[in-house]
């Protein structure tokens, strides 16, 4: 949620910032300003009436004592009571529309981002060299099938299209990746979280994914009551709400977390032909990094998360690039995002394996998450940041394809070998 003060101070700048995200919210901004004025006018008028009500109420004993007619006074008291009740009802309606519109506005992009969509994304740096083969490489679907890593047919039989089932050494490779991520984050001093996989609506609202994307996640309706839960599309939705409606001590910041969860996505639309396999599915494993920081520390925290994501990919031996996203390619909740992209040989080009983002105070305002500033004793909204650390659904196919040998076997990355009993190469039985 944006700061209303920021909108009121320079509404045209806010409109321009949102247009840089390729979103035109001019009408919404104008309506928010009108509702804010109407809200303040109603509150002022109600306070005036309550003051008159209090004054009239105090005058009644003196009027009775003097033997004067109190009927007009009681009539006025009744009028004030009715007017206050009507104002309260109007205020509830105004505030409901105001909140709905405020929740609908995307976050403003940082001013150094290029406007527009992905065509204006800016590669910042490259690591390593693109992988080259001296033989015709296989697609990861064929490699995973031949080596018994994944059973696509039975995965579909169990859950339908967009699902797969890890088997044998494939399951162990997947778990090795996750353990590598987890051990690295623990060594960096981050706290491990295993959150619920089903969340309340407010979690999606705080993260900025709801209400806009509420229909794009899986819902579970409790048959015994009216409660609806949502399968988490990413651990960010859970982590962002850990301190919802709380005030933290400044001395306790930053809070550094990571969480492992399966992620569930409906993924509207069908996958493209080149995305066959496990590149795009309805369920995948991911480790998510998250920080709560003071506003003045969030830029350094962002750099830290980017470096952590890069180091995880480096450790696996991949060539990759780090890309600064243009304003319009950042998600609605984020002020800035860097993507870490690797090559999956069968797909050509680069595919994102980690997005690291700074939401500034956008999520904190939506979730009312604050810290108490020691110097002033006053609560302030903190900043939230998140990043994939990492998701496996693209790392796994890239690892299998880039590490394949001419005979159809696959080399195990050195950092994963300890999780597989020292196994260095996996060959077809």
Predicted regions and their residues:
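N-terminal alpha-helical targeting/anchoring segments
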Residues: 1-131, 149
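TRNA-recognition modules of translation machinery and tRNA-sensing kinases, especially anticodon-binding
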Residues: 126-429
